[in-house]
Amino acid sequence: MLQLPDDVKQKYDVSAMKYAIHAAAPCPVDVKRRMLEWWGPVIWEYYAATEGGGTIAPPDEWLKYPGTVGRAWPSAELKITDDDGNRLPTGEPGVVWMKMPTASFEYKGDKSKTDENHDADGFFTVGDVGYLNADGFLFLCDRKSDMIIAGGVNIYPAEIEGEILAHPGVGDVAVFG
């Protein structure tokens, strides 16, 4: 939509729009800024899983922390751990875990998958890697299964894709290793 000519975009009155939800993966910062400039402060960032729990960022909070997928919903909790389950400090990427006291789930017919994605404290993970900032806003790096390790360094394809997508001559990109 952003590639539409300005005269086409200006033909449409979007002033009545109150809310638009962006979900599934973090929106590239440049794309989100341009959409907010066009549509106004109506685009909310949303991150969640069917299993329960999630985050949300209203437009003003996203502008304060570009790239965030938000803070935990009321009554939900987030934590970031290393591969051994130890909590990581603010700003340190690790496995994202969520907890929603009012929700529970299991993978139908797959107790071992259910068990490996839950911890003793009732948190679950879908395998995303991210970090929390000092104000509790979650930033996603990538899915752990997509991470590339080269020379002992963790490389997140989504970060590279975001940088490449910022170039005006690029319409879409996929990075894999």
What is each stretch, according to the model?
Residues 48, 87, 98-100, 105-106, ...:
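AMP-binding/adenylate-forming catalytic core of the ANL superfamily
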Residues 71-75, 86-117, 153-155:
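Conserved ATP/PPi-binding loop(s) of AMP-dependent carboxylate-activating enzymes
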Residues 2-65, 77, 84-87:
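Gly/Ser/Thr-rich phosphate-binding loop
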Residues 62-69, 116:
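Short, P/G- and charge-enriched loop/turn segments at secondary-structure junctions
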Residues 16, 75, 169-172:
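Glycine-centered tight turns that cap/initiate beta-strands
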Residues 33, 67, 112, 162:
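Active-site phosphate/pyrophosphate- and oxyanion-stabilizing loops and adjacent acidic/basic residues
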Residues 81-82, 118, 126, 132:
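Hydrophobic alpha-helical segments, especially N-terminal targeting/anchoring helices
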